[in-house]
Amino acid sequence: MTDNNIMNLLNEDCILHILSFLADKDKIQLSLSCKSNLKFLHKTIYDDIYFYSKIKHLSYYHRFKYVVQDTMDDIDPQPSNIKWYILPAHYTNYAIGIRRQYNVYIKMDDTIVDENKIEKFIDKYTYDPYKYLD
């Protein structure tokens, strides 16, 4: 009895080429659709931007092109090397805020970096305290 599945008819390289045109979510869903397709999960390159903390436990985490790590979590909440200053009275009308920054680590293996994609990601996950002052 022969299995007429399209995945059995195409070459593995052809399937990987087709997967390169799909969104990352679709790549994962197709790879998890049956046991014979699990091999594509570890051979596919994922193109979206992901937090390192979300993918570090995956066995195929090295297949992600763009990984972002939040370095604000690594800062000691009670640092010993900070100097405290008292602001003069005329500075009390100004809002003082810290914009959360992310270090973007991009694996550069002769690929073109889409800077708009990175800027959209940073804007999506950052808080601007001055946004509501206008």
Swiss-Prot record:
Entry-linked InterPro entries: F-box-like_dom_sf
F-box domain: residues covered: 5-52
Organism of this sequence: Acanthamoeba polyphaga mimivirus (APMV)
CDD domains: F-box_SF
Protein name listed in UniProt: Putative F-box protein R638
